[in-house]
């Protein structure tokens, strides 16, 4: 028996069953291990832009191995986006918020395990902190690097730049 399988006839069992059956979850799937896919995807940063596609692959893999997947979205701190406003004061609190969000969703829904799609230097520690606090079977998938951009100005035509190149050039410009 999985921790997510509530006692038949209990209030929690009835409410969950009503909610999930209305979402199209079949009766025979109700007894499977319920696995969260923690997805930090958003369209604010290139760190996360590819995670929705990976999430679909992970969902199918969970189904193929006898589990019931649930995508769970969280806030996604990114140094380059979150630090843009108010002198970066949201960066570390956002990481901690993410830990709390994961814990609330996992414990609130009483899910059996989680697979975390991690793709930034703040999401990885947050996922590891969540796994340690929750003490449920957890897998952290590091999902790749930031894609670079292509410059299309005069002498830089067809050159690719990553974020480090941008910082170096801004620094060079600032120092003359």
Residue ranges and their predicted role:
Residues 17-20, 35-38, 52-59, 63, ...:
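Predominant activation on well-ordered alpha-helical scaffold segments within soluble catalytic domains
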Residues 91-176:
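Active-site cavity-forming subdomains of large catalytic enzyme subunits
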Residues 38-40, 72-75, 117, 141:
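Generic beta-strand/beta-sheet core signal
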Residues 1-32, 56:
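N-terminal amphipathic/basic leader segments beginning at the initiator methionine
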Residues 1-4, 35-42, 75-88:
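Gly-rich Lys/Arg/Thr-decorated short loops/hinges at beta-loop-alpha junctions or inter-strand turns
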Residues 5-9, 44-48, 88-92, 117:
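Hydrophobic alpha-helical scaffolding
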